[in-house]
């Protein structure tokens, strides 16, 4: 790694520690030319797969779009911010775990519904009604009946 002070190539690691619950490594380094010390942080680069829309278009995964849908479904529901954040993290982990470069938008919707079903049944029905385009009250009733089984 280049020294930020003198741009020398030769630096050595003095100390390494895990930080951020083991998701990041903090390293103290010393330049062998000017003896200045500096800190670096190392994290894994985790790329999200691209999304294949129902019309066949491909676009980058948009976390804000997913979070917005989840938050709308959970609006005025007694679910903590921590629980919501954990659900979002689990969805993203499952998407990365597929190992695919592209995933269908339907998969993301199903993962969201799976998490909402565990978080709050009312939020699940709200999301499902939009996601599955419920046309009438009968479809709501059928989905509620499936929840009760």
UniProtKB/Swiss-Prot annotation:
Keywords, ordered alphabetically: ATP-binding, DNA-binding, Metal-binding, Nucleotide-binding, Repressor, Transcription, Transcription regulation, Zinc, Zinc-finger
Family stated for the protein in its record: Belongs to the NrdR family.
Signal peptide: none
Positions of the ATP-cone domain: 49-139
A molecular-function term among this protein's GO annotations: DNA binding
Zinc finger residue extent: unnamed: 3-34
Function: Negatively regulates transcription of bacterial ribonucleotide reductase nrd genes and operons by binding to NrdR-boxes.
One Pfam match: ATP-cone
Name of the protein: Transcriptional repressor NrdR
Cofactor(s) required for function per UniProt: Zn(2+)
GO biological process, one term: negative regulation of DNA-templated transcription
Recorded superkingdom: Bacteria
Cofactor note (record): Binds 1 zinc ion.
HAMAP family on file: NrdR
């Amino acid at each position: 790694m280049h020294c930020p002070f003198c741009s020398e190539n030769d630096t050595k690691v003095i100390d390494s520690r895990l930080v951020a619950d083991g998701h990041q490594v903090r390293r103290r380094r010393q330049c062998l030319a000017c003896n200045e010390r500096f800190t670096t942080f190392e994290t894994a680069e985790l790329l999200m797969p691209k999304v294949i829309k129902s019309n066949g278009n491909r676009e980058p995964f948009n976390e804000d779009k997913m979070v917005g849908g989840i938050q709308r479904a959970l609006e005025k529901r007694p679910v903590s911010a921590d629980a919501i954040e954990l659900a979002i993290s689990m969805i993203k982990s499952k998407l990365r775990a597929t190992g695919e470069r592209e995933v269908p938008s339907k998969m993301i919707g199903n993962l969201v519904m799976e998490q909402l079903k565990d978080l709050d049944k009312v939020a699940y029905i709200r999301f499902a009604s939009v996601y599955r385009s419920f046309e009438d009250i009968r479809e709501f009733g059928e989905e509620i009946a499936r929840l009760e089984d």
